[in-house]
Amino acid sequence: MISSHEVSAPSGSAQWRSIDWKAVERHVLRLQMRIAKAIREGKHGKAKALQWILTHSKAAKLLAVRRVSQNKGSKTPGIDGDIWNTDARRMAAVSLLSRKGYRAKPLRRIYIPKKNGKLRPLGIPCMIDRAQQALHLLALEPISETIADPNSYGFRPNRSAADAIQQCFKCLCKKGAAQWVLEGDIKACFDKIGHQWLLDNIPTDKRMLKQWLECGYIDKGLFYKTAEGTPQGGIISPTLMLLTLVGLEKLTKSIARKTGSRVNFIGYADDFVITGSSKEVLVNDIKPQLMAFLQERGLTLSEEKTHVTHINDGFDFLGFNARKYKGKLLIKPSKSNVLSFLRNMRDLIRKHATIPVADLIKMINPKLRGWANYYRHCVAKQTFGYVGHQMFLALWRWSVRRHPNKGRKWIAHKYFLNLQGQWTFHGWFKKAGKYGVIRLFDIAKVPIKRHVKIMSQANPFDPFWEGFLNERKVKNTGRNSWFDPVATAL
């Protein structure tokens, strides 16, 4: 017989690997649905009590640790240099998620380039702070999804830029549709949201929220306080911004009822468009009310990026251009986005002048495929053909520069396959002792499929929408499963 002291407790790694994640997710989802139901019924006290139960449950703590330790940023440390890269560390971290004695550490400030050449500051929290934010986000998201504007599509589950663009099409495509568009952009939205407004209005643990808002950041060894804004890089920040802007659509609709105008709101994060039947309504009625709404929250409209445009002149939104041509609405990839993408691809090719062809193709293909997937729901066939041709020219120049003493015919046969009369850039690779050929992704062959927009009122925390969202997920998975083979073993 084995005595009790001879039986060792399972290690942290073994405990983590033995977790039934489906059961954990079901437990958390049940609580989230109860929170959403309480909000729909106006029982805010009950919702607050359920939030407390959720944030103190082991299931929610497990999910929070898994999210921050296994996502894309999990290998990027905060100021303490700590990362949870083993199962044992993840299991140990679960017990650290306590409200008692918690104090958020300053963020590690880094800078990433923006499209306009400027630098965007990002604040990287420590792992424990990320996990605490992820934990409280589990309790906050059911509320944000229940009260969010129906036609707001950024930073929300089951929603995408494609949904926002399809809503633009729906609002503008008909003959009698509104002809004027207010393109709105909120200036430095994440950096300027007022702390007091957040503390007074966000339905979450105020003490924890205050910690995250006022933790400050360290930049080049110096500590700086934060008097406004939410940290770009914090897991909970997008939802805080979403809740800050809740009510924009309701505001525009109330103005429309008073003026008798046709007005529609489409939002995505801090970008939005408002369609109106006249320029006067947008400029004189809508815009002043928007500015007052934002000012209350410490925000302002960007004068550079906020315009009122006629639909016949077109407007850019989320990298797309929407414009009517002889009364017909066409939504295409924006010219600036196409040129920017090609510039980046040419730079990538130019910087890797000496690497093996197969390695270059492996770098290019995911970028081409991702860009095509983003735009394949709009009128993009001609654009895809143009991008494909420009890629051919860039890779031809790359091939010629590698062999200045060789003839064009020799270069063509070395780097390009003739497939049914079409020259395709290709390379060779060796894997497990076998040779194979890898081809450039043919963006011109990407099929155009109209995106089916999510229903505006759909809520993943309402059982009523469960069947609809599951069916939509299956359909979208099927739509995304088209495949153009690019690697073949011989």
List each language-model region with its residue ranges:
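Short, charge-rich, low-complexity alpha-helical interaction segments
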Residues: 1-9
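Right-hand nucleic-acid polymerase module
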Residues: 348-409
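Phosphate/adenylate-binding "loop-and-lid" substructures adjacent to NTP/NAD/dNTP-binding pockets
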Residues: 48-116
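Extended C-terminal regions of large enzymes
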Residues: 394, 399-488
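A conserved non-catalytic segment of reverse transcriptases
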Residues: 297-363, 367-371
